[in-house]
Design a protein with these regions (language model features):
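Glycine-rich, often proline-containing surface loops adjacent to acidic residues and nearby aromatics
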Residues: 69-78, 156-161
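A generic structural motif
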Residues: 78-84, 206-208
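N-terminal regions immediately upstream of nucleotidyltransferase
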Residues: 1-69, 81-88
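Conserved catalytic core of two-metal-ion nucleotidyltransferases
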Residues: 39, 91-139
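Conserved nucleotidyltransferase catalytic core and NTase-mimicking acidic/glycine-rich helix/loop elements
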Residues: 173-268
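Extracytoplasmic/secreted envelope proteins and their assembly/folding machinery
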Residues: 29-32, 36, 91, 95, ...
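Extended, alpha-helix-rich binding/interface surfaces that flank or overlap catalytic cores
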Residues: 44, 62, 116, 120-180, ...
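An acidic- and aromatic-residue-enriched active-site/binding cleft used to recognize and process polar
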Residues: 53-58, 77-80, 122, 131-133
Length: 268
C-alpha cells in the first residue's frame, strides 16, 4: 500500500498562505488604509463605493516570496450622472489621483495598464479598477471598461462565492490545492492566467479527496491545446511527469524521493 504525503502537502500549502498576522499583511493593510483615505479625500464625492476583490479577498493570494506578481485589486465604483462619461474619463481620474499621491513618492511607481491604474508601492501592486453601477431588471449590475472603449458587465464576487461553496463542500481542501497550483504556476512563469486557473480549479469535483488526492487529480485535469505556446505545453507535461514520479515513489514507500520529485514543480 502506498504511503501518503497528504499532511506534507497541506503543510506546504500553509507555507504558501499569506497569514493574517504576518508582517506582509500588516504592511498591505496599512497601505490599503492610506490608499482608501486618500481616495476619500481626493475623489470622495465622485465615488459611490469601493471594495477589495480578487485573490486577496478570496484568501488565495500568495506571499511575495513565492509570487512576485501578487497584487491587490480595488474596485472603484463612480457615481454616474445624466451626462454619461466614458470609461477612459474614470481611468484618467484614477491616474491623476495616483500621480498626485504616489508618483515618485515613497519609492512608488504609477502605471496606467488596462483596465486598471496600478500603484506599485512597497513591492506590492495595487490595481485600481474603475467601474459604474446601474439598476437592471431590479438588480444592481457592475460594469468595467472593455477594450473597445465601452463597458462590459462583471461580477467580481462570482469566483469568491463559487470557491467558498466548493471549499465547504469538499472539506476545506480546495483553497490549499489552489495555493499549491498557483505556486507551481508562478514559479514556472505563469503558463496559465492566475484568475483562469483559480476558476478552473474551483469547478473540479473533489468528492472523497484529501489534499494529496485532490492535488494529483487537479494536475491530471490540466490541459493545453495545439495552439498554446510550446513552452506552456512543455511545462504542463513536465508537471504531470513529475507527479507521476511522486506517485511511483509513494508506491515504493520512498517519501524522500517522492518529495524530491514534488519539488521539481513546487517551491520549498
Amino acid at each position: 500500500m502506498a504511503i501518503s504525503i497528504n499532511n506534507y502537502l497541506r503543510d506546504l500549502s500553509y507555507k504558501y498562505y499569506l497569514k493574517n498576522d504576518s508582517e506582509e499583511i500588516k504592511r498591505i493593510n496599512s497601505s490599503l488604509d492610506a490608499l482608501l483615505q486618500n481616495l476619500n479625500t481626493d475623489l470622495g464625492t465622485l465615488i459611490k463605493r469601493k471594495f477589495i476583490f480578487g485573490s486577496y479577498d478570496r484568501n488565495t493570494i500568495l506571499p511575495r516570496s513565492i509570487d512576485n506578481n501578487s497584487d491587490i485589486d480595488l474596485m472603484v465604483v463612480f457615481n454616474t450622472t445624466a451626462y454619461e462619461r466614458t470609461p477612459e474619463t474614470y481611468r484618467n481620474w484614477l491616474k491623476l489621483f495616483a500621480d498626485k499621491y504616489y508618483k515618485d513618492r515613497y519609492g512608488s511607481e504609477v502605471v496606467k495598464s488596462f483596465p486598471t491604474v496600478t500603484i506599485r508601492l512597497g513591492k506590492i501592486n495595487y490595481d485600481l479598477a474603475p467601474a459604474k453601477e446601474e439598476l437592471v431588471l431590479g438588480k444592481q449590475r457592475l460594469y468595467i471598461p472593455n477594450k473597445g472603449g465601452g463597458w462590459q458587465t462583471t461580477d467580481p464576487n462570482d469566483v469568491k462565492t463559487k470557491l467558498t461553496e466548493a471549499n465547504t463542500k469538499y472539506n476545506s481542501i480546495v483553497r490549499p490545492i489552489i495555493r499549491l497550483m498557483k505556486a507551481w504556476n508562478c514559479t514556472k512563469g505563469y503558463p496559465y492566467d492566475s484568475y483562469e486557473l483559480e476558476l478552473f480549479l474551483t469547478g473540479l469535483n473533489y468528492y472523497g479527496d484529501d489534499v494529496q488526492k485532490g492535488f494529483f487529480y487537479a494536475v491530471g485535469k490540466l490541459s493545453t491545446s495545439y495552439f498554446d505556446p510550446q513552452s506552456k505545453q512543455d511545462k504542463v507535461a513536465s508537471l504531470k511527469y513529475n507527479i507521476d514520479q511522486v506517485k511511483s515513489y509513494l508506491e515504493k514507500d520512498d517519501p524522500v524521493r517522492a518529495k524530491q520529485w514534488l519539488h521539481k514543480g513546487l517551491p520549498e
